[in-house]
């Protein structure tokens, strides 16, 4: 099962050209049903992550319908368990309708309330050595953003240095 999660994460990352974070630029009030679905997904994900014993995972969500590209998930970030217990997600989003992006640290609830196409998630668990190395980096805002490039392009070149796409940041 872990292999499938890694394959899904890799496919998502390699398909960054088509991927978006799923954020609509249209002002839209969330419905009670949307909030309930997002919070339920956050709770289910937290329980599953807690049960996994992992401290750090690559976490993906289905922000928009990318099925025409053969993709199921559109956005990913790094999730880590805090010493207090809750999970936090560090991920990059562009400012709506602009070519400027920032790295955000959110709880699972906020991560899954971001106008999802489908209320489902997938994650991959890195090796214990990778988790141990990433945990202090993710918990430290300055270190977590060291490779962040504010200039955003949805179709940025993976080896380019001028622009950066959301999923590209997570992989770098």
Per-range role (PLM):
Residues 11-14:
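Repetitive helical segments and hydrophobic/amphipathic motifs
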Residues 16-18:
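N-terminal signal peptide c-region/cleavage motif recognized by signal peptidases
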Residues 44-73:
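N-terminal carbohydrate-binding/catalytic regions of secreted carbohydrate-active enzymes
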Residues 1-7:
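Bacterial N-terminal signal peptides that target proteins for export
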